[in-house]
Design a protein with these regions (language model features):
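N-terminal export/targeting leaders of redox proteins
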Residues: 1-52, 109-184, 196, 247-251
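Sequence context surrounding c-type heme c attachment/ligation sites in exported
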Residues: 38-134, 180-251
């Protein structure tokens, strides 16, 4: 019988680690049904005031507008509950009221139940109809739509401003981000894909230091909703789709 020396034991452990799926090292959070992914329940004050919470379907809005319209021009914070939305503000043209004024979209007066449904799956039927009409490219996870590819192909052309035209910055630099674990190939970050939807200040400097390698982040933190996880856990494609960021990863 061959003796197991310390060197052989270490070698065996390395081989076993390389043979195991990299994502097996992380506990991925459970995902909602495809038709509910990206539907955010907003309940900062609604329940306290005896109203059903608002359900915000990102898919419905991102088909028409880029992220920067709400999370820039209209001052919606990325953090849930951090924006002091009120009925009074909406009726005076702030926040949701910037569009829901009876001209761009239905007005809030007399249409309370359209937003205050309290049911994250209320728009499931409309979502399926939308997919059939648009024929958007599909994705393996999230709500099943590759939104960025849909924009690249011109299938959808979301508007990037309401009144304040954004100053687009031509920056298409692609970053190669080395992973902390040797068995995981580098992540590829395409700026151009993100700037099609966002402004630079949506990420810099609050989420990421603008200096290269100035932000030290790990997958464990991303899975807690920090850094990339601010979007890629709730609205943008989730962490389950490993190869979207780590293209060198194998099954």
């Amino acid at each position: 019988m061959m003796a197991v020396t310390p060197v052989r034991l270490v070698t065996l452990l390395i081989v076993l680690q390389l043979a195991s799926p990299a994502w097996g090292h992380f506990t991925l959070p459970p995902l909602p049904p495809r038709e509910e992914y990206g539907n955010i329940i907003m309940d900062r004050v609604s329940s306290r005031e005896g109203q059903k919470p608002v359900v915000f379907p990102h898919w419905l809005h991102r088909a028409r507008y880029t992220c920067r319209v709400c999370h820039g021009e209209l001052d919606f914070q990325m953090k849930r509950g951090a924006t002091e939305i009120s009925e009074r503000g909406n009726r005076t043209g702030k926040f949701c009221g910037a569009c829901h004024n009876g001209k761009i979209a239905f007005r809030s007066n007399g249409n309370c139940d359209k937003c205050h449904s309290g049911d994250s799956g209320y728009s499931a039927g409309r979502f399926d109809e939308f997919l059939m009409k648009t024929s958007l490219p599909m994705a393996a996870s999230g709500n099943g739509v590759d939104w960025s590819e849909g924009v690249r192909r011109g299938i959808i052309k979301p508007q990037s401003f309401l009144k304040k035209k954004s100053q687009d910055m031509a920056f298409d630099r692609q970053l190669l981000l080395e992973a902390e674990m040797a068995i995981i190939p580098p992540a590829v970050f395409p700026h151009k894909t993100h700037t099609a939807w966002l402004d630079c200040d949506n990420c810099h400097p609050d989420l990421f230091n603008i200096k290269r390698k100035g932000t030290h982040f790990a997958m464990e933190e991303i899975l807690k909703g920090r850094y990339c996880g601010v979007c890629h856990m709730t609205v943008a494609f989730p962490m389950d789709d490993c190869r979207r960021c780590h293209p060198g990863m194998h099954e």
